[in-house]
Structure formats: structure tokens, C-alpha cells
Amino acid sequence: MSTNEGSLWGGRFAGGPAPALAALSKSTHFDWALAPYDIQASVAHARVLRKAGLLTDEQLGALVEGLEQLGRDVASGVFVPADTDEDVHGALERGLIERVGPDIGGRLRAGRSRNDQVATLFRMWLRDAAGRISEGVLDVVQALADQAGAHPDAIMPGKTHLQAAQPVLLAHHLLAHAQPLLRDVDRLVDWDRRTAVSPYGAGALAGSSLGLDPDAIALDLGFTAAADNSIDATSSRDFAAEAGFVFAMIGIDLSRLSEDIILWGTTEFGYVTLDDSWSTGSSIMPQKKNPDIAELARGKTGRLIGNLTGLLATLKAQPLAYNRDLQEDKEPLFDSVSQLELLLPAMAGLVATLRFHTERMAQLAPAGFTLATDLAEWMVRQGIPFRVAHEAAGEAVRVAEARGVGLEDLTDEEFAAIHPELTGDVRAVLTTAGSVASRDARGGTAPERVAEQRELVLARLNVLRGQNGRHPG
């Protein structure tokens, strides 16, 4: 006959669950990650029980001493879940009772449920994980800013639709990848403000009748406040879904950067060489240097998106309050964090060690008639309507393409035939350096504007590192 050993329930039942049910319910293989937080929260809960008069000073002291010893044993690996333990909560209660006895250890469960307990622990774990992820993202931003600083004047082809568009600074392009990553960290900072609300004290769903103080335990655990609604506190996982979205968005932003690096490293582009330490070879082709980090970033982004999608599907259509479906909320987030913790240091190292071939980029910058817009805007400055100037620039491209020359190589006669006010003076703006320098409005690709952008990125990076200081990591 099966028993309820290792469970936090059982009095209602004549026997234990069927083996298949026990196997299905078991979660220690993943929720053991919450064990340090469970012990920390149990110490705080014991203090609240004492404040409510439900423990004596001696009982509180024994509980805290037992929990601290249990925490050391968990950290060292001396104490691990048993096969009979259903979840992290039951395993730790068993461990506590082994250390302080059932009379003392059995008192800790008063006034709390696994429902409010796990909702709190999951928030604690995620807040710390988000801090670590933020640091990793900021390391990638730092690498991008450093590369931008090392190449302040390098000009490259700017592209739209992956076709030649306009010349831009390499630094401008690199900082364009830094901006969304900074926004991702901003999102995590904003997310933390909403997540710093403690469900502890909500009980199963209705709150506690034992005179406990949810605000006291919230502050003890580093939250800003206790939840306003006990039903919402135990049943909502929007904080997890929101974190999952930001993690997926980080992956998407890294994937876009990775796609550029992959393309730039091809023979056809030839913009960069990958450092040997951050690339791999082929088992059959001796010449290969493969961008595995960038490719894995693309691949893992699909995994991050899948984790978010799976969690959202789990959350839909659940009635209030807690449902066992929510056992499935943690593994997707645990996996997303694990994948980003693998990926982010590798991406930072890859970016920091890229060797750019700036002469090659400068050579290709005017290819594909990327100065056609400069020609049109020169005509606008002569008082010609842009519609007319656009048509004239397009015709100039057609004529130059037919001759196999650049726009600057058209003769004065060819310019005049295209439009009477299009003269040879236009050649003054038909250089990549002049084109880049002319884009000097805020956010533009002119060197002084890009230098300002880099300073803003570095300033924001430093602010975000300071805001991230609450996370022990």
C-alpha cells in the first residue's frame, strides 16, 4: 500500500497516491533550485509566527538554528531530496524535522500554504536571475560600445532590405545594436518594480486567520510590499510571463546582432574576422572558421520564444485561484535563464574580439549607388522639389549603371541632360565621407553625433549597472 510519506498532505486520505500519480506530481528534479529561497523565507516566516505569539523565543531560536543548519547542508550537498519527497517544500520540512524534531519543525507550516510559498519563492528566484541576466546583457553592450570607440571614423555600407542604401559609420551600426539591449535591461528594471510584491501571507487563497503580518515578511525578504489581493497573489503568473517575454526579446536582439556577424564574416562580405578563441572549425574542411556562437544565438532564440509560448499556453483559461497547472510555470523560465547565462558571456567575448576590415568596408560603402540620396538632397538645397530631385537622382543612377561607372564619374553634359540645374558642382557631395558628415541631426551617422550616442550609451549602461545592484547574482 502506498503512503503519503514526503507529502505535506494526507490526513484526508486512507492511503497514498498511486505510483503513476506520485511520479507525475514529483517536482524536486527542478524545483530544488528554490531550496535556498525556501529556507530564507522559512526563517522570515518563523519570525512572523513569533511576532503573532504562535512561537516562544526558545522555539523561534530552535527553528532558526535548524533552518540555518539545513541551509548549510543544502549548499554543501549533504542534504538532498529523497525519492519519496514530492517537492522542495516537503523535502525541506522533512530535513528540518530531522534536525529539530517534529514538535518544533511541525510548527513552521502554520499560516502558510504551498500556494503562497511557491509564488513568493519563484518571484525571489526570478528577481535574482533577472539581475544576473541584466549584467550579462550590459556586458554585451559594453563590448559593442568599446568596438564603436575603437572605430570612430570607419565607414561601411548601410543597408535596407539587405540592399545597398546609404553609407554609415560602423560605430553607428554597432551602437544601433546596443540600444535595444539597453531597452531590454530597462524592461527588467521596470518588471522588477511590479514583481517586488510578496504573496507570502496569502495562504492557499483566502489569507490567514492567525494574525500574521504579510508586510513584515515582505520587507524581510526584500520585497517592497505585500500583495493587495490574496487570490491574485497565489494564482497569477503574469510576472513570469513578462520575464519570459523579456528573455525572449533579449534572444531576438542577440539573434539580429548574430545575423550581422554571420553575414559580415562570409567571404562575400569580408567585413570581419572572428577570433580563434570564439569560433570553431570543420571536421572535414580545414579552411573553415565557423561562427558557432552567433549561430547558437539564433538557434537558442527559438527555444526562448518556445518557452514563452508554452508558458502563455499553460496560463490561459485557468479559473481562480491556484491550479496544479502552475507546476509547469517554472521549468520554461529556469531553462530560459540557463540558456541566456550560457549565451551572454559568449556573445560578449565574440563581439569584443571581432577584427573589422575597415578598408574593405570603406571600399564597398559607395557600391550600389549609395550616394544617390546625397545627389537628390543637393538638388533640394538648390530649390528643386524633392519629387523632381528624386526622379533626377534615379535617372542618374540608370545612366551611371549603363556606363558601368559611379555617380561621381558622370560628365557635366550627362548631368545637364538629366536636369538643367544638375551641374558638376554636385560632385562635392558624392563622397562617402561627405555623405556621412552631412547627416548631423540628432541620431544621425555624422561622427560627432555618433560620438554623442556612444557617450549616452555608456552613461545609460552605468546607470543600469547601479540599478541592478540589489541582485546578489
Curated annotation (Swiss-Prot):
Cross-referenced Pfam families: ASL_C2 (PF14698), Lyase_1 (PF00206)
Keyword Lyase in annotation: yes
Pathway assigned to this chain's UniProt record: Amino-acid biosynthesis; L-arginine biosynthesis; L-arginine from L-ornithine and carbamoyl phosphate: step 3/3
High-level lineage: Bacteria, Bacillati, Actinomycetota, Actinomycetes, Mycobacteriales
Enzyme Commission designation: 4.3.2.1
PROSITE patterns hit by this protein: FUMARATE_LYASES
SUPFAM superfamilies assigned: L-aspartase-like
Swiss-Prot/TrEMBL catalytic activity: 2-(N(omega)-L-arginino)succinate = fumarate + L-arginine
Cellular compartments annotated: Cytoplasm
Top EC class for this record: lyase
Entry keyword set: Amino-acid biosynthesis, Arginine biosynthesis, Cytoplasm, Lyase
A GO term, aspect molecular function: argininosuccinate lyase activity
Name assigned to this protein: Argininosuccinate lyase
A Gene Ontology BP annotation from the UniProt entry: arginine biosynthetic process via ornithine
Family as reported in the entry's similarity comment: Belongs to the lyase 1 family. Argininosuccinate lyase subfamily.
Annotated Gene Ontology cellular component terms: cytosol
